[in-house]
Amino acid sequence: MEFSPLLQRATLIQRYKRFLADVITPDGRELTLHCPNTGAMTGCATRGDTVWYSTSDNTKRKYPHTWELTQSQSGAFICVNTLWANRLTKEAILNESISELSGYSSLKSEVKYGAERSRIDFMLQADSRPDCYIEVKSVTLAENEQGYFPDAVTERGQKHLRELMNVAAEGQRAVIFFAVLHSAITRFSPARHIDEKYAQLLSEAQQRGVEILAYKAEISAEGMALKKSLPVTL
């Protein structure tokens, strides 16, 4: 998926109030960007990092610029806009770039399901096959090439795992899909040191038939695409 129009570059001053970030452009202008990420953004928002941002043509927006990517001082590209995880996953499924999720004739988004009144990110369907329920998570936390999720305690994420276990118990296919949006990550594990309950539930989910997939995106200032399956260690 290509960025159109192309992203613009700036240098990060600070992220604050969760949804805002101040940057300096190459010509010395100071801008305030919308930050579309409610997470901790550990390692993704260091002062001096390069920020790549888009600009909306919607004149009613208070903050027309949106922070899309970080290019860390070590050179790693990180997608901080969490909306891209679902966009890239949908594109990869439709292009059949994810072999484990190929061969379906129908893709639906935001389908209501489950006892806890959730919405599944994607449901795949095909004749003579069980429905496939897919929950997508964005992975940007990295330590020594190891990717982790979550970057903060997530009761919502725990709920999604419980719902997927129920789906698998009903004979349908249940998949938790980790979209790795950090170019330095080479392998994935749950962040037990941050949310032990989530890590425990992920192991339980696998034992109960929930499939765990992790795919890494190729990221540049020109575009992104999910390309490579990564090893998962629980």
UniProtKB/Swiss-Prot annotation:
<keyword id="KW-0238">DNA-binding</keyword>
<dbReference type="InterPro" id="IPR041465">
    <property type="entry name" value="SfsA_N"/>
</dbReference>
<comment type="function">
    <text>Binds to DNA non-specifically. Could be a regulatory factor involved in maltose metabolism.</text>
</comment>
<dbReference type="InterPro" id="IPR040452">
    <property type="entry name" value="SfsA_C"/>
</dbReference>
<feature type="DNA-binding region" description="H-T-H motif">
    <location>
        <begin position="201"/>
        <end position="220"/>
    </location>
</feature>
<dbReference type="InterPro" id="IPR005224">
    <property type="entry name" value="SfsA"/>
</dbReference>
<protein>
    <recommendedName>
        <fullName>Sugar fermentation stimulation protein A</fullName>
    </recommendedName>
</protein>
<comment type="similarity">
    <text>Belongs to the SfsA family.</text>
</comment>
<dbReference type="Pfam" id="PF17746">
    <property type="entry name" value="SfsA_N"/>
</dbReference>
<dbReference type="Pfam" id="PF03749">
    <property type="entry name" value="SfsA"/>
</dbReference>
<dbReference type="GO" id="GO:0003677">
    <property type="term" value="F:DNA binding"/>
</dbReference>
